[in-house]
Regions:
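Terminal targeting signals and extreme-terminal segments of soluble enzymes
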Residues: 1-126
Length: 126
């Protein structure tokens, strides 16, 4: 239950240790001045997908680093973020995220590095 995610209309469809799926249905409030999905929305999807995937192990995480490559624009319909865990360690989890539209066009690709706040209490081995 994260107010910022609810505010943006992001829906968490599936959460898993290896893969998670989130989506948002485009609406006017999420557009940039040119009628396309705002870059901040795509970045939020990448960051959120990385975070929920990291937290699937039951621990608390914050974003340590994130990068994104914007590849194509989207103007309407559903935008989906699909994450895949690259590495899950004791203190750091790295997640790759692809953002696609309804036609499966790749809109953005990002990598999120998540830092575990409660790593000292964890039994996860790096």
């Amino acid at each position: 239950n994260i107010p910022y995610i609810q505010f943006n209309g992001i829906v968490i469809d599936r959460i898993g240790m290896e893969e998670s799926v989130l989506y948002v249905d485009m609406r006017h409030e999420l557009e940039n001045p040119y009628g396309m999905a705002h870059g901040g929305l795509l970045f939020t999807l990448v960051d959120t997908a990385g975070g929920v995937t990291a937290r699937a192990d039951g621990r608390k995480y914050v974003t340590m680093d994130a990068s994104i490559h914007y590849l194509q624009s989207a103007r309407k319909g559903r935008i989906t973020a699909t994450s895949r865990t690259v590495r899950r360690g004791r203190t750091v989890t790295v997640v790759d995220v692809n953002v696609t539209d309804e036609e499966e066009r790749l809109l953005a690709r990002g990598t999120v590095t998540m830092f575990c706040l409660d790593a000292e209490e964890s039994n996860v081995k790096s």
